[in-house]
Amino acid sequence: MQQPPHARIAALVDGDDAAVRARRLRAFEQAFVLIVVAEYWLRAIPKWGLLGRHYDVLLGVSTVAGAAILAVPRLRRPGFAALALAHLVLLWSEFPSSGNHAYLETYVCLLAVLLRPDDPDESLLELRALRWLAVIVLFFSGVQKLAHGYWVNGEYLVFSLGSETYRTLLGWTLPADELARIARMSGEVGDGPYRVASMLLLVLANGTWLAEIALAPALVWRRTRTVALVGALLLIAGIELVAREVFFGLVFASLLLLFAHGDRQSAARWLVAAALVVLALSRLGVLPEVTYY
């Protein structure tokens, strides 16, 4: 019997991982929960008492929900429901300044509420949904950069060079006088122009959105999936090395690893846990301070 069109489209991201599907989904969810709960805490530590009473409540809810998901399997669904609710309140209370990755995290939580990794049919649907979520986010990240127009001529990167993290890693792409001119601007009305003649910076700017748009369909096609996965992970690592949006980077890298052959999540969750420990020690002052968001 021929599958309906929507089922054939959903199956495009399938792999040869039926035997390890449940295990890799559980490992992904464990890493994801660690990231989300750590994000609540690491955001609160430097601003303790300044984020409002509602944030204290959300911090408590996310901590209890995360512990329940990790420690008591039968509380998985209510735990993810609590995390989703906490994120929805966070998005509502901080709109429009809330980070885009909070929406992505909310979608993942809602999928986990609706679908169970230990059910063969539901685990297949959850894995497909998570993979398509990664493809859609990657593709439309590139489309958004193109549509807004601030990457084609490099304006966004030039504007971002006003921050220390961008200057440290990308300052070498511009002559010293251009870099000094950009550093003097503060993003106020009348500042500019935010355009430069550096061909290297233009290649980096346009290469970013082009890579995002190209890698997304390459992840779907099995013949190019492995190469696309490596390329996407390197792209995300490069972007986050500059932008320092580490929580989005960890979540999205975990989503991308769902395209890998076999069960890579079981090992990746320990790497995620180690990275979060390092970030926590940095924020607590035990390790040298690192700027991240």
Feature roles, as predicted:
Residues 2-293:
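Alpha-helical membrane-anchoring segments
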